[in-house]
Swiss-Prot record:
NCBIfam families: AcCoA-C-Actrans. The active site is at residues 92, 382. Residues 1-16 form a transit peptide. The modification Phosphotyrosine is found at residue 127. It catalyses: an acyl-CoA + acetyl-CoA = a 3-oxoacyl-CoA + CoA; 2 acetyl-CoA = acetoacetyl-CoA + CoA; acetyl-CoA + H2O = acetate + CoA + H(+); propanoyl-CoA + H2O = propanoate + CoA + H(+). One of its GO terms (molecular function) is fatty acyl-CoA hydrolase activity. Expressed in liver, brown adipose tissue and heart (at protein level). The modification Phosphoserine is found at residues 121, 310, 333, 344. CoA binds at residues 224, 227, 251. The record marks 352 as: Increases nucleophilicity of active site Cys. It comes from Rattus norvegicus (Rat). Pfam families: Thiolase_C, Thiolase_N. It is found in: Mitochondrion. This is 3-ketoacyl-CoA thiolase, mitochondrial.
Amino acid sequence: MALLRGVFIVAAKRTPFGAYGGLLKDFTATDLTEFAARAALSAGKVPPETIDSVIVGNVMQSSSDAAYLARHVGLRVGVPTETGALTLNRLCGSGFQSIVSGCQEICSKDAEVVLCGGTESMSQSPYSVRNVRFGTKFGLDLKLEDTLWAGLTDQHVKLPMGMTAENLAAKYNISREDCDRYALQSQQRWKAANEAGYFNEEMAPIEVKTKKGKQTMQVDEHARPQTTLEQLQNLPPVFKKEGTVTAGNASGMSDGAGVVIIASEDAVKKHNFTPLARVVGYFVSGCDPAIMGIGPVPAITGALKKAGLSLKDMDLIDVNEAFAPQFLAVQKSLDLDPSKTNVSGGAIALGHPLGGSGSRITAHLVHELRRRGGKYAVGSACIGGGQGISLIIQNTA
């Protein structure tokens, strides 16, 4: 929808994204959000006591404190005890949804300043044993369930997420070569943006322990900037014989978090915040679960229609790269301009910590739009189970 009140982004930060089992594996999703929240509060000069609500998106609930996630983040960073907190889950759209829900609270005047976040520690996703709480039968083998793999499989249509991408490849005539070439482009664009310092404004460095002692992590760990097309072409398909999806052209499992602080126009004036961008509108749409990756098409189309804008008005477009064929299907459907779409690479390069990607995309669009002097940007993600979500922002510089 288009917003009923003026809502502005006054801070947007994210952690570097860690590789699966990498440098961030010992930090919980709560820890990661705390790092991003502290950085956002500091960068936006937002006193914690001005926060009226804390909303954090998280999917896997992978740590023992996950049920308390948003509440603990607020308390850790000094938000008043009286301020409420909500942990939500719209799967891969959770980071975007935290901002959408924050906008709704501001538009209904339930809040004036909201700390919105998205986070995931995929590395900490546990194995579980079901049906043992009330005892087991003699001789019954206990089965360990990988909660991460289970979460990436849609039991309703009995398809792993990768197969939904294969369905899109077949429907839109997308070849394996198309996918590998796009994956290479994602890595190369990430490399160019990283070397140019284009992630610096959004990044919240983290001190990590390594074999060489403590060091500051400020670069995404999953990216493989030296990747070649030949290397990508040599990888086997994962989900289907002669398929298109490989480990090299799918988003990387990773760990990371982002925080976007939003405020009403009244709060911006009252607290003298510096608005970085205005939230123009958003849209959520359902789609066929068997081709869930096409979700950004109705989501982006719906958001633009509500806002009275078109794709030509957008200076930047960022669609989460869950899988190369999924992104290419969206690009083909909407006829997206490659020169302004995913300009700094995407999840194929830097990883997709489920709940964190919407926050990461929004933070990057905020700062990249300002760097380029553009006016409008739209970010979007497909969502397992068959949904899409999108968010339109406007540069206030």
